[in-house]
Amino acid sequence: MFTLKKSLLLLFFLGTISLSLCEEERDADEDEGEMTEEEVKRSVLGTVKDLLIGAGKSAAQSVLTALSCKLSNSC
């Protein structure tokens, strides 16, 4: 059982190294100045996500403020 685990771990490790080398080679082939379509999508989605998180935080803060006001009867 232990030898099976060792061999599977070795195959996983070698596959990971092979995959990372392929990715590095592919990245080296692409132009450095150009943004790929995936990078553009990631940046747009990241911006939208940040905006939604900010809006959610402000909405939650206003709800919590209103609740604390109602609970303490200090409105």
Swiss-Prot record:
Q: Where is the signal peptide?
A: 1-22
Q: Which Pfam families match?
A: Antimicrobial_2 (PF08023), FSAP_sig_propep (PF03032)
Primary role: Antimicrobial peptide.
Q: Into which family does the record put it?
A: Belongs to the frog skin active peptide (FSAP) family. Brevinin subfamily.
Where found in the cell? Secreted
Organism per entry = Odorrana livida
List the keywords (alphabetical): Amphibian defense peptide, Antimicrobial, Cleavage on pair of basic residues, Disulfide bond, Secreted, Signal
Q: List the disulfide bonds.
A: 69-75
Its chief place of residence is secreted
Please give the name of this protein. Answer: Lividin-3
- GO CC annotations, alphabetized: extracellular region
